[in-house]
A protein has these predicted regions:
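Short, hydrophobic secondary-structure boundary micro-motifs
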Residues: 18-19, 84-86, 95, 153
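An amphipathic alpha-helix adjacent to DNA-recognition modules
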Residues: 3-7, 11, 16-20, 25-28, ...
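Amphipathic alpha-helical packing segments from all-alpha helical-bundle domains
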Residues: 67, 71, 92-118, 124-139, ...
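C-terminal peripheral helix-coil segments that are non-catalytic and often amphipathic
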Residues: 112, 143-176
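Short, surface-exposed loop/turn segments at secondary-structure junctions
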Residues: 86-89, 119-124, 150-154
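Amphipathic alpha-helical interface segments
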Residues: 5, 9, 136-143
Length: 176
């Protein structure tokens, strides 16, 4: 109920104008109950997108586009208005930060494997690389949502995966 109310308010008011007071009233949830679970609306936003972003981040380690990535992109396309609002508004920076943290974990796992050839050590700090990949991934999704429906979900998944993997290969070499 709370997440559904949050989504509705994001679409109608925009993120900046969503207040915890309005959100809890709309969801018929007490403010104290809200704060038992979330520190504030930023925390709620992070929670609401976490499952989607963890799948997108996994593209860094997966050798092929996963079924989970197809499912996530299908969901994103079905929720195009909400996704576009999140990708283009003040929330984009939050999404980038959360995705970068998830990507950094993926890259750290690859870096641990880099002690044994043929994977090369990373060429820059992982936080910087993860942030760059996060911006590229969300940019690709935003571009896909901006296009007409001629680009299907499978194509979008292949492009997102290929561009993410190209970044990983550039950082770690061909076996990354």
């Amino acid at each position: 109920m709370l997440l559904a109310s949050f989504d509705r308010l994001l679409l109608t008011n925009g993120y900046e104008d969503v207040s915890v007071r309005e959100l809890t009233a709309n969801a018929d949830v007490g403010r104290s109950t809200f704060y038992e679970h979330f520190e504030g609306k930023h925390d709620l936003l992070e929670h609401s997108v976490a499952r989607v972003l963890v799948v997108i981040a996994a593209a860094a380690a997966n050798r092929t586009p996963s079924d989970a990535l197809l499912d996530v992109l299908t969901h994103v396309r079905a929720q195009r208005a909400l996704a576009s609002a999140l990708l283009r508004g003040s929330t984009r920076a939050i999404l980038i930060r959360v995705l970068a943290l998830k990507l950094e974990r993926q890259l750290a796992a690859l870096a641990r494997r880099s002690a044994a050839p043929p994977i090369a050590p990373p060429i820059a700090p992982l936080a910087f690389l993860a942030l760059s990949l996060a911006q590229a991934q969300l940019g690709a999704i935003d571009a896909w949502l901006s296009c007409d429906d001629s680009c299907d979900v499978q194509t979008a998944a292949r492009v997102l995966h290929a561009t993410t993997r190209a970044g990983v290969v550039a950082v770690f070499g061909s076996s990354g």
